[in-house]
């Protein structure tokens, strides 16, 4: 499948775009098409492939969308404090006293919801490649006054009954009460905490069932459930809200999700490369690093690489490369590409990786999107205040 070429007007260099991304861009009342991302040390200090992801977003989405990557660099024009009032976040965030192996990820978790509530738009993790315009993916539906949708996201299925929302891609109208309450719950978990350890058993989440990841190979996951649930504490805060009915505020979680949340399948739309390779990051790296020349298509390994990239481009709107949980024996493509020796692995001429990089700027996915529902878990239903502990 050849990558269709799209007319995009004058093309700025990577350096030009990166320089522009360092500038402060205020949000006006009329701005709705905002893309939000975060790298605590500043975008220019992120791995090169992450920088190119964001640069590719700009090429794909400009001029309709404004991309901002916030940071925690002292004096930076894109410091989080330029966009979020201090009272919306905890002291552990502002004082940089968070601990644990995922400080960057959880700092990012803390800011994404305030940004969406205050300004609206789409949150993207910097590990995402785009293969479809955000307008076609979800924003046209959110913006249309004839539709009820306020929020759009990807659904992670843990089995026939259990599912949760992937927080690496969240789109929301400005002022969505769902985003507001979700953040209130998550912020409460961080009151007095310096790490995510033990958050899965916080009183606000203790009533939720165990969301055990499904086995892909007949074996149990290579990590403890508590480790998994603590890492994903933010998504379980939404599980509380999704199953909550609060008579004082009028919030009805099951009704809101039934009527106002636009959901698509997460594996199909973001993790198809992982599905095709049994979540083997080393295999993904080796296949994408192969040369794509026509002369090599008789080679079985090259055919496998071709099937991987064409599978992704025929199936997915995005491609998410996660670092995930630190797990013995598991490699992630994101970690491999982070290595300085692989600083150009996503753009090495003639490789399948370079083909995907080109696709992230020029290919437009047109596959029909099928909205999904999230089943209500009866034993998780709760009548209480948004942050009320019920014992």
UniProtKB/Swiss-Prot annotation:
* Keyword Transferase found: yes
* UniProt-listed Enzyme Commission number(s): 2.4.1.-
| Pathway connected to this protein | Secondary metabolite biosynthesis
**Which Gene Ontology terms cover its molecular function?**
glycosyltransferase activity
Give the range the annotation lists for the signal sequence: none
Sorted UniProt keywords: Glycosyltransferase, Transferase
Q: What is reported on how temperature governs activity?
A: Optimum temperature is 37 degrees Celsius.
SUPFAM superfamilies for this protein? Nucleotide-diphospho-sugar transferases (SSF53448)
Task: Please convey what the UniProt record notes about how activity depends on pH.
Answer: Optimum pH is 8.0.
What phenotype is described for loss of this gene? Failed to produce fumihopaside A, but leads to the accumulation of the aglycone intermediate.
Top-rank taxon of the source lineage equals Eukaryota
> What modulates its activity?
Activity is significantly decreased by addition of divalent cations such as Mg(2+), Mn(2+), Zn(2+), Ca(2+), Co(2+), Cu(2+), and Ni(2+); while Fe(2+) has little effect.
One Pfam match: Caps_synth
Described by its record, this protein's role is as follows: Glycosyltransferase; part of the gene cluster that mediates the biosynthesis fumihopaside A, a hopane-type glucoside that enhances the thermotolerance and UV resistance of N.fumigata. The first step of fumihopaside A biosynthesis is performed by the squalene hopane cyclase afumA that catalyzes the cyclization of 3S-oxidosqualene into the hopene 21-beta-H-hopane-3-beta,22-diol.
| Family in the record | Belongs to the afumC glycosyltransferase family.
Query: What is the designated name of this protein?
Result: Glycosyltransferase afumC
Which organism is this protein's natural source?
Answer: Aspergillus fumigatus (strain CBS 144.89 / FGSC A1163 / CEA10) (Neosartorya fumigata)
Query: Highest lineage ranks of the organism?
Result: Eukaryota, Fungi, Dikarya, Ascomycota, Pezizomycotina
């Amino acid at each position: 499948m050849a990558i269709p070429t799209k007319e995009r007007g004058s093309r700025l260099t990577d350096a030009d775009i990166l320089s522009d991304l360092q500038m402060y861009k205020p949000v006006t009342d009329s701005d709705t098409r905002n893309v939000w991302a975060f790298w605590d040390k500043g975008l220019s200090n992120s791995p090169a492939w992450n920088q190119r992801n964001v640069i590719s977003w700009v090429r794909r989405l400009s001029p309709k969308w404004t991309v901002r990557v916030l940071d925690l660099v002292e004096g930076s024009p894109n410091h989080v404090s330029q966009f979020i009032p201090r009272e919306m976040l905890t002291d552990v965030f502002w004082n940089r006293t968070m601990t644990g192996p995922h400080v960057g990820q959880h700092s990012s978790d803390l800011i994404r919801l305030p940004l969406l509530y205050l300004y609206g738009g789409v949150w993207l993790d910097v590990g995402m490649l785009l293969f479809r315009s955000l307008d076609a993916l979800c924003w046209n539906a959110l913006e249309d006054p004839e539709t009820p949708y306020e929020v759009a996201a990807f659904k992670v299925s843990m089995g026939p009954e259990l599912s949760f929302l992937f927080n690496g891609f969240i789109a929301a109208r400005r002022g969505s009460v769902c985003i507001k309450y979700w953040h209130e719950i998550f912020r409460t978990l961080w009151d007095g905490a310096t790490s995510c350890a033990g958050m899965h058993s916080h009183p606000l989440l203790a009533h939720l069932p165990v969301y055990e990841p499904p086995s892909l190979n007949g074996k149990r996951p290579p990590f403890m459930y508590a480790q998994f649930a603590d890492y994903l504490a933010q998504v379980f805060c939404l599980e509380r809200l999704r199953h909550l009915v609060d008579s004082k505020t009028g919030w009805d979680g099951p009704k809101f999700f039934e009527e106002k949340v636009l959901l698509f399948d997460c594996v199909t739309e973001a993790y198809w490369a992982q599905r095709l390779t049994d979540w083997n990051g080393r295999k993904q790296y080796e296949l994408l690093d192969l040369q794509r020349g026509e002369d090599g298509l008789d080679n079985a390994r090259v055919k496998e690489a071709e099937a991987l990239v064409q599978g992704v481009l025929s199936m997915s709107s995005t491609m998410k490369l996660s670092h995930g949980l630190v797990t013995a024996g598991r490699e992630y493509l994101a970690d491999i590409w982070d290595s300085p020796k692989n600083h150009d692995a996503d753009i090495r001429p003639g490789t399948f990786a370079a083909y995907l990089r080109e696709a992230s700027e020029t290919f437009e996915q047109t596959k029909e999107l099928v909205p999904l529902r999230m089943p209500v878990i009866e034993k998780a239903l709760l009548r209480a205040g948004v942050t009320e502990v019920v014992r």
